């Protein structure tokens, strides 16, 4: 790719960032489509995020992806949020239109799209959702919008627990889905929730390097063949949770599905063009 002065810059702001496959994926897509953009990753944490947004405006960047730990903070630095992003309380995409910043969340639509593409119908189903960060709440919100009957959210009593309660209230007030929040330390409640669940989704960092040998499911017998187990983590590709799920006879969806579909939507938001999906799946080794 020959980058010229006509090229516009798209960023990714996160910390840590070295593990991300998004720059490779987006740049391959941009090159295939012949579009005058280049995508670069920047190590940005909560402390440096405000300055990074000022830099985005000053450099007239087309926009940026936003990942951990900035997804919730980023809502405070855009001029407009989509209705879904307001429901989530977090964004992963910013589009810059001449200094006017719009915030979107494609994590939820991407993950739910990956589930649907597998042939699974979420309408009327119950999801056990692990975590209350930006990815988890995005998945929960989109699932509620698209027809989940119930979401049983489990999170440790950390700084995200109150945010989880607020998220549940927003979803309960604005959709037909019923969301409950329970301390993950309550293993009896966790076991009971899994027994009646249709979907288990991990939206936490547990399973991601350097936590690749960990899983929030301590007892594999809690998993049953009728359960669909989905993962947000894609590095490593086969997390411990997915290994447990396959051993238990569950159908699984790895983190590549969410990465692909959320990235496809981002691509269109930034460029106005269709994402070369089949090409990217092939060159990135994401499979069918």
From Swiss-Prot:
Q: How does it assemble?
A: Homodimer.
Q: Which HAMAP family match?
A: Shikimate_DH_AroE, Shikimate_DH_YdiB
Residues annotated as binding NAD(+) are 132-135, 155-158, 205, 232-235, 255
Q: What is its EC number?
A: 1.1.1.282
Expression induction:
Induced under carbon limitation but not under phosphate limitation.
BP-aspect Gene Ontology terms = amino acid biosynthetic process; aromatic amino acid family biosynthetic process; chorismate biosynthetic process; shikimate metabolic process
Q: Which family does it belong to?
A: Belongs to the shikimate dehydrogenase family.
- Phenotype upon changing residue 106 to A: 2000-fold decrease in the affinity for quinate. 70-fold decrease in the affinity for shikimate. 10-fold greater reduction in catalytic efficiency is observed with quinate than with shikimate
> What protein name applies here?
Quinate/shikimate dehydrogenase
**What happens after mutating residue 107 to A?**
Loss of activity towards quinate. 20000-fold decrease in the affinity for shikimate
* Alphabetical list of InterPro entries matching this protein: Aminoacid_DH-like_N_sf, NAD(P)-bd_dom_sf, Quinate/Shikimate_DH, SDH_C, Shikimate_DH-bd_N, Shikimate_DH_fam
Record GO terms (molecular function)? protein homodimerization activity; quinate 3-dehydrogenase (NAD+) activity; quinate 3-dehydrogenase (NADP+) activity; shikimate 3-dehydrogenase (NAD+) activity; shikimate 3-dehydrogenase (NADP+) activity
Q: What is the effect of changing residue 71 to A?
A: 3200-fold decrease in the affinity for quinate. 170-fold decrease in the affinity for shikimate
Q: What class of enzyme is it?
A: oxidoreductase
Pfam families, from UniProt?
SDH_C, Shikimate_dh_N
Key words, A-Z: Amino-acid biosynthesis, Aromatic amino acid biosynthesis, NAD, NADP, Oxidoreductase
Biological or metabolic pathway of the protein:
Metabolic intermediate biosynthesis; chorismate biosynthesis; chorismate from D-erythrose 4-phosphate and phosphoenolpyruvate: step 4/7
**Mutating residue 39 to F: what's the consequence?**
Kinetically unchanged as compared with the wild-type
Binding residues for substrate = 71, 107
Q: What is the effect of changing residue 71 to G?
A: 10-fold greater reduction in catalytic efficiency is observed with quinate than with shikimate
Q: Which organism was this protein described from? A: Escherichia coli (strain K12)
